[in-house]
Design a protein with these regions (language model features):
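Switch I (effector-binding) loop of TRAFAC-class P-loop GTPase G-domains
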Residues: 24-48
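Canonical P-loop GTPase G-domain recognition
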Residues: 122-171
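ATP-binding Walker
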Residues: 13
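Conserved C-terminal guanine-recognition region of P-loop GTPase G domains, centered on the G4
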Residues: 77-140
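Single conserved hydrophobic/aromatic residue that forms the stacking wall/gate
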Residues: 178-187
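Walker A/P-loop
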Residues: 16
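Switch II (G3) loop of P-loop NTPases
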Residues: 53-65
């Protein structure tokens, strides 16, 4: 089992903000406008003595004719194929969208370790509302409400991640190759 974690979801759910928090660097650009992240970004993180690679992806949009959204979708699919654990991120403020349903079907078909990350749970009401995401039908998938902006819930998220990756904190050479190859890559 590899120690590769992919952060995926629809546009503007906070994937890049969480990525920056996990790698403890501002490597991914964060913006309110969708489509800013177009390729995969790689970084290293560690928690409880376990080191793992984190992949940030652009926002997944199904059946788009936009050339950029098609390329983003390709990058997301590649990240999903590389990952041993998927962080499927949704937005508590917006609630469930049709894109969340579309993407949850893909996640179910992959049959990989997944954690449903209900982001933007910035207060108790939003945290309670995060329970609606169980409607996505991801059975046996833990769901955790977080706020990637202020960091609440990220410790618990990292506990879940570290329980799903192997105990050997050595990364495969492939992980380091990806880090070097994609750190500045874009199209």
């Amino acid at each position: 089992m590899s120690n590769i974690i992919a952060i995926v979801g629809r546009p503007n759910v906070g994937k890049s903000t969480l990525f920056n928090r996990l790698v403890e660097k501002r490597k991914a650009i964060i913006h309110d406008e969708s489509g800013v992240t177009r390729d995969r970004h790689y970084g290293l993180s560690d928690w409880n003595g376990k080191t793992f690679t984190v992949i940030d992806t652009g926002g997944y949009v199904e059946n788009s004719n936009n050339i950029f959204e098609k390329k983003i979708k390709e990058q997301v699919i590649l990240a999903l194929s590389e990952a041993s654990v998927i962080l499927f991120m949704v937005d508590c403020k917006d609630g469930i969208t049709s894109l969340d349903y579309d993407f949850s079907k893909i996640i179910r078909e992959l049959n990989k370790d997944t954690i449903l990350v209900a982001n933007k749970a910035d207060n108790n009401k939003l945290e309670i509302n995060s329970n609606e995401f169980y409607e996505l039908g991801l059975k046996n998938t833990p769901m955790i409400p977080i706020s990637s902006i202020n960091g609440s819930g990220t410790g618990e998220l990292l506990d879940l991640v570290s329980n799903k990756i192997n105990n050997d904190d050595k990364l495969s050479p492939v992980s380091y190759t990806h880090l070097r190859a994609h750190e500045t890559w874009s199209y």
